[in-house]
Amino acid sequence: MKKIKKLIIACDGEAASGKSTGAKLLSKKYNLLLINSGLFYRYSSKKIIEKKPKNIINFLKKELNSISYKKISKQKLHSEAISNHVAVLAKNKKVRQIINQLQMKIIKANKRICVEGRDIASKILVKNPKYDVAFYFKCDLKVAAYRRWLDLKKSVSLKEVKKSLSLRTKI
């Protein structure tokens, strides 16, 4: 079978719906670079929580410009505090623009890539470059809450996780 030279796969969907699992399987099967766009928001939230900058826009421009995706992906970014902060941060239009520009830079630099994240197919990879294949993941709230609760190693109650996901799904 001939290897496809250019392939952009987008895995979009709701919080805790299985996007990451699906994207990992696809990137492994087709030997693609895997980018989890949510990690940019999680990393940004972690740094904002730690450093408490006065101007988050300038802070994030500098912070995200000076770190590689590889380093971001190795951080511990799945805590309830970070998840709750991401829900607020993701509503900031300027923050989304900064993170989207960074994602586009990475995507344009790689011909074979699988990008996973909310709005990646519906708003981000709609042109230049546009995805070749897109998947949308949807999951029942009870199942999504249980999946996230397991990810959090049961450190918070299932009820709290369900409430948090319910709020995040509305973003």
What is the meaning of each model-derived region?
Residues 1-6:
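Phosphate-binding P-loop
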Residues 9-11:
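Hydrophobic anchor at the beta1->P-loop junction of P-loop NTPases
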Residues 14-17:
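ATP-binding Walker
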Residues 20:
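Walker A/P-loop
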Residues 27-37, 50-53:
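Post-Walker A helix-loop "phosphate-sensing" segment adjacent to the P-loop in P-loop NTPases
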Residues 39-113, 119-125, 142-146, 159, ...:
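ATP-dependent small-molecule kinase phosphotransfer cores
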Residues 126, 134-148, 152:
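Glycine-rich phosphate-binding loops of nucleotide-dependent enzymes
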